[in-house]
Design a protein with these regions (language model features):
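Short alpha-helical transmembrane segments in multi-pass integral membrane proteins
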Residues: 1-21, 65-121, 177-244, 285-325
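Juxtamembrane/transmembrane-helix interface segments of polytopic membrane transporters
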Residues: 55, 63, 130, 134-138, ...
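Membrane-water interface regions at transmembrane-helix termini and the short interhelical loops
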Residues: 31-39, 59-68
Length: 325
């Protein structure tokens, strides 16, 4: 992926540490999904925010304080994800013991496994397809040089801190839509989507008031003050992406709502749209606009996905309402 030779070793170390954290990622998604399924979407969100804040604090301690560099960043991610899993386990044992398997519940049920695979595999493929576009964009950015690699990495860490809220609103909508579909209360689904969009827009205003004036200061959490060029480029990335956060918020709400309604194959196609958009940006926009083109990689992908998801959700919603009638 055109990784510069001078950062290849560090990138390899960080990647290996990320792979080591995969069991924690799987465990968190499994446990938080179970908690949400019982109607509690707040607690997993609080745990995720806690883990994100701990990640940032550990980054400062391990990278700036102890000078561990990329190893410190990887260890911080590893530890913060582990903490989120422990918090989920603690909450289940304390408040939701119904989720702890007992007796025959520990036995495998082939029919239930089949249902889970039918819903889960398309969702997994969706993220894999989206990742192809991200790899293409990363490759195009790496070819620009180490300054841009550092700017991209720093901006992504801050971006994920802010955008995890959109992700959790979407995940909550998946549970909400699934529950109301089971009860055939389709009007509540429409009300929930509208309410979540309003919540998303309020949160967007909050992020704008933070990111637009303070993006440079945020970047200094991960970048040495002496690397002014990296700070400038990373802040530019954050500001451009922030303008399009409503598009990202709408994407997560509609995509997860469609998944909650049982049409994972349909939501997977939005991932294809994202992949096509990022590949197009990598092949044409980055060569023409350099770093500015990279900054528009995510926004273009979000808009393309929305152009598919909006009519797809409206069609699906009308289709389901006709079935009820």
């Amino acid at each position: 992926v055109n990784t510069p030779k001078e950062v290849f070793d560090d990138a390899y170390i960080f990647l290996m540490l990320q792979f080591a954290a995969i069991p924690f990622t799987i465990a968190y998604n499994l446990l938080s999904g179970q908690i949400r399924a019982l109607g509690n979407s707040k607690q997993p969100f609080y745990f995720l925010i806690t883990a994100s804040v701990i990640n940032i604090i550990l980054d400062g301690i391990l990278i700036l304080g102890m000078g561990l560099g990329v190893e410190g960043a990887g260890i911080a991610t590893w530890l913060s994800q582990g903490i989120s899993v422990l918090l989920c386990i603690w909450f289940i044992k304390k408040k939701m013991q119904i989720l702890i398997p007992k007796g025959e519940e520990r036995n495998f049920d082939n029919k239930k496994i089949s249902i889970l695979l039918n819903n889960g595999v398309p969702m997994g493929l969706q993220f894999s397809i989206t990742a192809i576009g991200l790899i293409m964009l990363q490759s195009a950015n790496n070819a620009l040089g180490t300054v841009y690699v550092a700017a991209f990495t720093a901006s992504m860490r801050i971006k994920y801190l802010f955008t995890c809220v959109f992700e959790n609103i979407g995940v909550a909508m998946a549970t909400y839509c699934g529950q109301n579909l089971g009860a055939w209360k389709l009007d509540r689904i429409g009300q929930g989507v509208r309410a979540s969009i309003r919540m998303m827009l309020v949160y967007f205003v909050f992020t704008f008031l933070l990111i637009y004036p303070f993006a440079d200061e945020m970047m200094m959490l991960f970048v040495d003050k002496g690397e002014a060029e990296v700070v400038t480029y990373a802040a530019q990335f954050m500001r451009i992406a922030n303008y399009f956060y409503p598009c990202l918020g709408l994407l997560t709400i509609l995509r997860y709502s469609i998944q909650g309604l049982g049409y994972s194959n349909l939501s997977m196609l939005s991932g294809v749209m994202e992949m096509i958009a990022r590949c197009g940006v990598s092949l044409w926009l980055v060569p023409a606009l350099a770093w500015t083109g990279v900054c528009f990689g995510d926004p273009v992908a979000w808009v393309m996905a929305d152009l598919f998801l909006i009519p797809a959700f409206l069609w699906l919603y009308k289709h389901l309402k006709k079935e009820v009638l």
